[in-house]
A protein has these predicted regions:
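Cofactor-cradling patches in redox/metallo enzymes
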Residues: 142-232, 263-280, 285-369
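Short cysteine clusters
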Residues: 11-17, 21, 56-62, 66, ...
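Iron-sulfur-cluster electron-transfer modules
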Residues: 5-8, 25, 35-211, 216-223
């Protein structure tokens, strides 16, 4: 990227980016200063930690708030790429990248275990040359993390209940590389983008449904060769509910609220579909957080932050948990595996297990059938 591409010269140093940045108050990251520093060649000799590069969650709140179209989050990714090229990265980030290269996922798990989440489900494995309505892209976190696997299994239950023709890639499914790109590993992203595009297209799907907003965003916006419609799973569920193919049999009797994942909400404007599912389940017991939709507070899970220790006191996910409890909710729903993990951890670190449960929307809907 260039200064011109990022519209950096349009910056008027108004500070709206830093004022909206969810982590700037507790870390060295300051989007306004970073743009100024970059434009005036003042970043030379400063470390990534001094610049706060690893603190950015790439939530793009800074970009959304900029009145001149400057994209500070993209500048962070560009500057990170220089750090990655030099080899100056944390052990955690290096491990995630090496695991992606060797095993096709950033979690250090063997490729042969990628389908363990689906044990006993007898899922159709799509082969090259075949055809299907929906190719379900499970994503690395839902495939490997024990907390997120139930959400993937619940989604399978829902698709079957609705009579959807679908299949999965199986053990060959490989990381979408969305987070690797945001970390700054552009070369790895391009390689996986091309191989994943081929892997998906040769299986003949009419559409791709992603369980993760990060995979959804990558396929929709960063995979130009993917010539079939891409959906997040909540969009498909809303479609099935509206068509009457999914009919909840039991209403949720608890107060439910919803955390908008950044990569689903403010970056792709998918706000209504998740709420349609929750309103079908909870009716007027569904309540909105004060910071929701375009102004939703980031949980700190994106932009490679799953492999970076959080700086400063307190975590944004803990704020989200407290806000939910103050609202009177006993269930905080979301639609992203990273959000599920950060929020679940925040429930524990705030000693709120008896007050609040974190649930994926697919889990809630499957429980109602």
């Amino acid at each position: 990227m260039s200064i011109e591409t990022l519209e950096l010269k349009s910056c008027i140093q108004c500070g709206r980016c830093s004022g909206g940045c969810p982590v700037s108050m507790k870390s060295s990251l300051n989007p306004r200063k970073l743009v100024y520093c970059y434009l005036n060649d003042l970043c030379q000799g400063m470390s990534a930690d001094e610049l706060g590069l690893w603190e950015c969650t790439t939530c793009t709140t800074c970009t959304e708030r900029c009145p001149k179209g400057v994209r500070p989050a993209d500048l962070v990714v560009e500057m990170r790429s220089k750090v990655i090229e030099s080899g100056r990265m944390t052990t955690q980030i290096r491990g995630a990248l090496e695991s992606t290269y060797l095993q096709g996922n950033p979690w250090g798990r063997g490729r042969e275990k990628r389908m363990d989440w689906a044990e006993g489900l007898d899922l159709p494995i799509l082969k090259p040359g075949g055809k299907t309505d929906v190719l379900l892209f499970v994503c690395c976190t839902n495939a490997y993390d024990p907390r997120c696997q139930p959400a993937a299994r619940a989604l399978v239950q829902l698709l079957r209940a609705a009579g959807v023709e679908f299949g999965v890639i199986g053990e060959e499914e490989t990381c979408c590389s969305s987070e690797q790109r945001r970390i700054g590993e552009q070369g790895m992203f391009e390689e996986l983008r091309d191989s994943n595009t081929k892997l998906i297209m040769e299986r003949g799907p009419k559409r791709v449904v992603a369980t993760s907003p990060h995979s959804f965003n990558a396929f929709k916006n960063d995979y130009p060769g993917l010539s079939v419609p891409v959906m997040h799973y909540t969009q498909l569920l809303a479609e099935l509910l509206e068509a009457g193919k999914l009919k909840p049999k039991r209403q949720i009797e608890e107060v439910v609220t919803y955390h908008d994942p950044c990569y689903l909400g403010k970056q792709n404007m998918v706000f209504e579909e998740p709420r349609q599912a929750l309103q079908a389940l909870a009716g007027d017991r569904f309540v909105e957080l004060d910071r929701s939709r375009e102004t939703s507070l980031c949980c700190e899970g994106g932009g490679g932050r799953m492999w970076v220790d959080s700086a400063g006191k307190g975590r944004l996910a803990e704020v989200r948990v407290r806000d939910s409890i103050d609202l009177g909710a006993t269930i905080l729903a979301t639609a992203c595996p990273y959000c599920t993990l950060t929020l679940e951890d925040a429930v524990k670190t705030t000693d709120s297990e008896a007050k609040l449960r974190i649930k994926d929307i697919a889990e809630l809907l499957a429980e109602s059938l």
